[in-house]
Structure formats: C-alpha cells, structure tokens
Amino acid sequence: MSSDAMSDYSHDDEHDPQTDELRETALVTLEALISSCSSQMQSYLPNTINSALRFLKYDPNVADMGEDEEMSGTQDDGSEDDVTEEPDLEDDDFEDFEEEGGYSDIDDMSWKVRRCAAKLLYAVISTYGRGRALDDTSLYQQIAPAIVARFNKEREESVKLELVSTMDALVRKTAEGSMIMTSSGFLESVGSGSKISRKRRRQDSDASMIDFEPSMGTSSAAGTPLAAPSSPQSGPQSELANALPVIVRSLVTMWKQASIHLKQAIIILLKSLALVRYGGLADHLQQIEDPIADVLKSSLSGAPSASIGISASAGTLQIETLSLISAISETHASDALLPFLIALIPGVIVAVNDKNYKVSSEALAAVEQIVKALTPPRVTTASQDLIFQLEKLYDVSHSRITDTSADLEVRQRAIHVLGVLLARTSDEQGSAFLSFEKRSKGLVTLVDRLKNETTRLSAVRAIDDVAVLCSRKDDVDSNWVREVTAELGAQLRKSDRVLRSASLETLRSLSMNPNTRAHYDGETMKNLEECLIPLISVEDVHLLAPSLIIIAKLVPGNAQLLVNDGLVSAICSIVRTSLAGTVLKALLLLVKVIGEEGSGLTLMQNLLQDVGVNGDTSVVGRSIGTLLVHGGSNVGVRMEDFLSELQKTQDPQRQCLALAILGESALRLGASCSLTPNVFIPHFNSKSEKVRLASATALGNAAAGNVKAYLPTILGGLEKSDPQSYLLLHSVKELLQHPEMVRRDVAPSALKLWQALLVVSKEEDNRAMGAECVGRLALLDPPAYIPQFQEYLANGDAGIRSIVVSAFRFTLSDSRDVFNDVLRPLIVPLLVNMLSDRDLGNHRLALTTLNSAIHNKLALILPHLGELLPAVLGDTQIKPELIREVQMGPFKHKVDDGLELRKSAYETVYAALDTSFSLSHITELYSRILAGIDDEQDIRTICNLMTSKLITLAPEETQRHLDALSERYTAILNFKPKENAVKQEIEKAQEASTGVLKITRELSKAFPNAETMGDHHKWKAYMEMVRAQFGTQLSNLESEF
C-alpha cells in the first residue's frame, strides 16, 4: 500500500478494524524496505516520514486528532521561563482517560498502527541518521516534536516503549561526530561504537635520546576534566538543548504509570541525554531524582536476590539506573551534583550489598564515579556532610572486600573503588576528606588482598592508583611501601603474564614517584634489583623498558649497592641485539645515570672487551658514547681513543662502532665537542654500505648537538643534489629526531632545508626518506609548515605531491596539543584534496593517509567522515580502465593496476567500520563487502574481517545478508583449481576456503536460529552443504578456538 493510499484511508469516517490491520501491514512493510533497501527507498523517504508521523497519532476513538503542540517555538501561556511547555502534562489528564468526552470504549486495536508508526520512525532514524538523505530539519523539526508530543498522550504501554526507544535513537544520532568521555574510560562517539582506548600513554615517542625522562603513568583514579555543556546557537545540539526540558518533564510524568520495561527504556534515554548533552541535565537533576530513587528503593525494601526470585527485568532496571548515576556523576559539575548524589547515596549503598552480583558490581561502578565527583580536584572544600558521605562509601566498599561470601567480581571491583578513594584523598587537601585511621586501614587491606591469589591482580592495580597520585611522602608509610614492593617483586617470577606486567607497572610508578621512592631502604632496593635483573632480556621487550627505568630511578645515590656484576652482565647481554624506541631510550638513561654516579668503569670495560663489535654496533656505540660523556675520567678511555681507532682501522665493523661512539659523544657534548663534519663525511665514500650508513647516522647525531657547526655542511650537500644525498637525508633524519634540542637553531635555515628536501626527494630512491624528513621538519614548527602542505598539493608535479602526502601521513602520529590545534581546521581540506589526486600512486597514498588519520586523529575527522568516506567506498569498485593485457611469451595475462588501490580502500573502510558513518550506511557497506568477496584473495580476507566485526556492530543487517553471503561462500568452496595449476594457485584456493570456513563458523555461532526461522533458505542449504562436505575442516577450526 502506498503512503498516499494510506493517507486516503485515514480520512474514512468509519473506523474499520480490517483497514487498521492493512495499515499495520503497510507500515511493517515500509519498515522492512527502509532497513533492507535504504538506497532504493531514499526517494520515498519524505512520504514515508509523513505517513509515519500521521499514524503515530492515529487514534480514531479520540474525537480530536488535531495537530499536536510544537516542541519548541511559541511559549505556553503558563510558562514562567523561556522554556516552551507542553500543556497536557498534568497527571490528572491521563488517570481517567476513558472518561474523556472524546473517547469511545469500543474494542480498540489502533495502538498497533501507532506502534508500527513509531517503529518505522526508529528504522528511518537508525538507517539514515543525520545523512544526506535525512537532513536535520526532518529530524528535529518534524520527527522529534511529534515523538515528544505523543509521550504523554499515548495510553498503550507498548507504544510508549517504542516512542522512548525512537527518541533514544534520535538523541544518539544527535551525537554523531562528537567525542564523549564515558564512565567506561573511553572516548566514545555516542551511537557509533567507536572507542579510543585510554591506555597508559608515555608522551615520549618523539623525545630525544639525550633528554629522555620517562613520564608517570596515568591512573584511572585521576578521572577526566569536565567540559561545560556547549550552548550552540543552531544545529542539532541546539535543537536538543531546547527540547530537553520538555523531554525530561514528559519522561518524569510517564514514569508514574510505567512498567519495568518502560522504566528501563526511560533510564536508558536519560543516560543518552546525560552523555550527549555533556552536563546538560544539571538543571533537571531534582526532577529525575525521584524516579532514580524509586528504582533504588527496590533494594532498600529488602527484596530477595535474583537467585531466589527477583525478576531479571527488575535487576536489569537497577543496573541501568546505577549506570545512569555513573554517567551523570562523570559528566556534571560537582556543585550541581552534591544534593542529587547525597540523596541517592543510601540507595546506592544498599545496591552495593545486593546479593545479585551484577547489581552489586554496577553499584560499585557508580560508587567510583560518585567518589570522583565528591573529592579533589573536583571538590575543594571538605564539609562535614561530605566527609560523612565519603566515609559511608568507604565503609561499604571495604566491607565488600572483606566479605568472603561476596562474588569474586564484586570483591575485585570493590578493591578498585577503594584504590580510587585512597588515591583521590591523598595530599594535604585530599587528606581532609578521609580520616587517617580509615586511610591506614584501607592501605593495609590492599596489602592483605595483594597476598591473596584471587584478588591479587585487582590489588596490584589499586596500589598503582595510590602510587601514581601520591603527592606527599606522608601519604604512605615506609613499612607499607617496602612490604608492597616485596610482594610485587615476587609476582615478577610468576607465569601469569598479565599479573607480571601489572606488577612491573606498579613498581615503575612506585620508583618514579619521589614521594614513594623516598621510603625505600637499601635492602628493599637490593631485593628489587634481584627480581628485575632476570627481566633485562630481549626475550620480552615489553618488560624490558620498565625494568631498565626502575633501576635507573634507583641508582642515583645508591650506585655502590646496585651497580654490580649482575647488572653489568645484563646490560651487556641486551646490547648485542638491535634496540629502538623506548627500550633504547631506557637503556641509555640507565647507562647515563651509572656514568653520572662515577660507577661506569666496569661497564665500560665489559662493553669494550666482552661485547665490542660482536654486539649491535649502533646500540653498543650509543651506550659507550653515553657512558664516555657522562662518566668523564672515571671510565678509563677518552673520545680521542675512538677517533684514533676510526682513522687507523680498516675493519668495517670497528669503523661502524667508532662512528657510533663519536656521533653519540658529539650529540651529548654539544658545542663543546671538538669534532667537525670532516670526521664523518669522508666515510660516505667507504666501500662498505654499513660504514656509509653509520657515518651518515653519526653525522646527524653530531649535528643535533651542534646545529650551527654542522647544518651548513649538510644543507650545502643537499642543495648540490650530491650523489650522496641519500646519506645526507639519513643525517637530516637523525638531526630532526631531537626536536627540542634543534628547534631554535634549525629555524633560521628551515625554509632552505624544506626546499632542498623537496628537490632531493624527487628521486625515487630518496622519496621515502625525504618525505619522513619533510614531515619531521614540519613538526618543528606546525603553524608555519602544515598549512604549506595544501599549497604543495596543487603542484603540477606528481612527485612533489607524493612527497607531501607521505610527509603529512608521517606527522599524524604526533599527539601534541599544539599540533592538533593547528591540524584541526586543516586536516579535512587536506585529506579531501589528497583523495582527489588522479595520479594512481598518490591516490593510494591518500587512502593510506586517511587510514592513518582514522587511527591517530579520529576525534578531528569523525564529524567529517561523511565528506571523506563516500569517495573511499567508490575506490573499492573494480575500474575496467585500470585493467590491461600483458603479453608473456605465447600467453596473455590481465594485469589489474587498480588492485592495490582497492585493497587500500577496503583497509580504510575497515578502519572506519565502527564509526557512526559506516553504521548509518550499512547497506551500502554490505554491498561493497559482497563485491569484495568476489574480488582477489587479499581483498576477500579484509571483507571477511569486516563481516566478523559487523556481527557485533550490526547484527540485524548481518543476519539479513546471510543468503547473499552464502551464495558467494558456496562459489569459493566449490572452486577447483585446474589440473595443471601451480603450487601457488592451489595454496591460494586453500587459503580462500579456510577463510570462508572461519567466517562461516562465526556467523553460524552468532545466528544459530537463522537455519530454523525459515527466512534464510539459502543460508540453511549452504550450512547443510558445509557440514556434509567440510565437516572435518570445521571440526579442526573448532579445536583451534
């Protein structure tokens, strides 16, 4: 039935139940078409929305079906403020609805029509979102007011439930493109599923080797800074802000007669509002306090636990309500929260003691956020009432830890909460919020839990929180620190890798914080070193860097105790292997402090005699150079000894080692170093490639120490386009790897260097290294150079554009705020420009650059993916003009020059898969996945990964495509290589079959009912074929997992 026909029916004078049934069927059909055929339905969208809105208020038994009041616009006469009010919100208007004059009490089934209309709107919002087909006007001036107006006019529970769910979908769509910090500890785009992990970040990836100072890890107890709710003048956020008072008031009214399921939907909507309008519920907390307290009272009344009769839905409602409290606590300013939270704390405490472990665990999560909201730095003054509330939260958390009858998950969560509370109440200001007695008792409890195998890991992480935020020596006592250190050291010998890593990370925090490190005595440090030395091994580099850093922090003032044969042997064992990044920086830091303490003689002797050229010459050379400079006269050798060695020896290995030592020495000595460029440049002509590269690296290191003396020579060589330009690019790279050291001295020559790099990098062999140098140079002064990328992208030379694209991609790994501020207005225009490059190689580079931007700068580009990803989806299509025939002997072969481009496009789509754009274009996305399965094996593999991910992200759409997937999977499994096929072709076919069987297994497990529902006949036949013909392979896959 068409929308117009439906509209005609609505004007009939008589109420015909059969007509209602037909309308219901039509609306259900429209919902299915919108969900399954979104592209084809775009032209019918306006009519579809109009029909849904009309039948949303279809109620033939009520005489007046006039237009509903608008959500915003003119003020109601009774309004005392600037917020538009809905007139029909009083309770009395709904208590005796059937007694109203316009209502007929005949058997009324029209609610089914209204429910289907609401579900249709839900499908429209979920499928199209805020996209090209559905603009903000339709969402916020048509759909939203109609839903809000219907909230309290609707009588049927099931229709109300659909209305609330539809509004929740709309609210989440409002947040598309905005990054929200959630209580789970992630930056999340609401409604997108995109998460950026807040792992411990060491902001030292670009730090110079010479000034490396490891940073303290972040703590989950530190919380996140609150951002004031934005007040946009226009747009979806503005529309939502205007509607917020009416929505909240309507939900509170609806709550009074709501069932558990409807209450749960209301709570979920309130949580979405709290996250989307970050801090925006501040003026409405008093209104929603009663509904929240109403749910918590089910615990206060002493209801039995889930195991002995409490309904699952009631428990789920409690969990959602506690999650709402967490979200509000995290997103709203403490000044507004205090009365609200203090009123709810008793109910939360009772929920913590609930026998349903899921309720108890979620209540503890709420306690964590409440604690953060009621402690410094968010609260500065400790009132008696506040202290009393915090002590109650402390008591309930502590009691759950010591309650042996509590579920393990609850006890572990309580330990975490206790750690947060103790960490947040340290220092002089924080100590006023928790008594000394309770603090001491809590610290003892953490040690006690550290000794228990089941709670050990949680205790380790809680202690780490305390260590990171300890800001006074008096916050912890010496015995506690020493006992904790001994226990943590013992865990380093355990086989549990997660426990070992967490224990080492906590030891790192204890050693790096001077307030906790001050409690160490000689015996503790000696025992700790003995636990750490076995970890100074290249067998597990993830444990190596923290171990080196811990010892480096303990050595100052304790060198005679700690610098011994065991430590020296361990250092000498790791320099035999190539090291880079943080591990190399940590090693050089340790070598540096050993030299500064005057204890480097034994280490120097061992490095020269026992390792020497047998180790990695770069690592050994940098270690010796560091020790030479910082050990001074105590190490038994001088720089001149290595200069003489370089001039005399003909052994390439010895030359490489001497060059590395001299380069590192010159770097650290700076302008006081007597070495000149002529020490290194003659070796550019060496017959040994290793020596040539070593001399280039050493020249760059020396140049970083004395830019004024070295840069003119390097720049002169580059401007001449010297045949040795590739080596000079290596030197420039090393020079720019010390940005803080060289920034000021490079600045006067930066423009010349920039231009020289672009010229030299035109050569194919120089392009990759040159682009990295251009990127590093741009990062020295982002405001000056990042805007220039746009200018060079218009250059007619494809080679120049290639360099600029690669250089820009290199810069994206920089996480500094100063760079992000420059990049924010430029990144999208730059990417759009790059993606429009017609040069095939450059276009592929642009795709990999967008991929890098999605991984590194998602917050900056997320609101603009609608501008970027449609072109990428276009690049996943096979382009016949890029396929050519090549004659090879008597045979003709087809060569697809677009294959790598398509592969890069699919990789980029995969990277953006869990963003709001992809999920709102899911039908189009699946069409490209289906096409990719028919493509080459590399692309097919990516499509299988995408399908696997969409099982979780878009289960309904994935299930809808099972038949289409099965057709393509069948073709792959039935493919038989020719009898004369070469080994490579046979292996390729086997790899394709295995990949299909793996994803088949995942789909089968995710949708076990698909074979029995009767809607997926092709999928059912396919699964029967797979089990019959590939049962053995499936069994093998099961055993693997």
Curated annotation (Swiss-Prot):
Family the entry assigns: Belongs to the CAND family.
Compositional bias segments (type: Acidic residues): 65-103
Entry keyword set: Nucleus, Repeat, Ubl conjugation pathway
InterPro entries referenced in this protein's UniProt entry, alphabetically: ARM-like, ARM-type_fold, CAND1/CAND2, TATA-bd_TIP120
GO CC annotations, alphabetized: nucleus
Chain residue ranges for the region called Disordered: 1-24, 64-103, 189-237
Pfam family, one: TIP120
Biased composition (Basic and acidic residues): 9-24
Ranges occupied by HEAT repeats: 138-176, 242-279, 339-376, 434-472, 479-516, 525-560, 598-637, 670-708, 710-744, 780-817, 822-867
Record-given protein name: Cullin-associated NEDD8-dissociated protein 1, C-terminal part
Biological process annotations from GO: cordyol C metabolic process; diorcinol metabolic process; orcinol metabolic process; protein ubiquitination; SCF complex assembly; sexual sporulation resulting in formation of a cellular spore; sporocarp development involved in sexual reproduction; violaceol I metabolic process
Subunit structure: Interacts with candA-N. Interacts with unneddylated cullins culA and culD.
Biological role stated in the UniProt entry: Assembly factor of SCF (SKP1-CUL1-F-box protein) E3 ubiquitin ligase complexes that promotes the exchange of the substrate-recognition F-box subunit in SCF complexes, thereby playing a key role in the cellular repertoire of SCF complexes. Acts as a F-box protein exchange factor when interacting with candA-N.
Chief location category: nucleus
Superkingdom field: Eukaryota
Comp. bias (Low complexity): 225-237
Record's subcellular location: Nucleus
Disruption phenotype: Cells show a dark red color when grown on an air-medium interface that induces development. Cells are able to initiate the cycle but are blocked in the initial stage of early nest formation. Cells exhibit reduction in asexual development and block in sexual development.
Miscellaneous remark of the record: In E.nidulans, CAND1 is separated into 2 distinct proteins: candA-N (AC C8VP82) and candA-C, corresponding to the N- and C-termini respectively of the protein in other species.
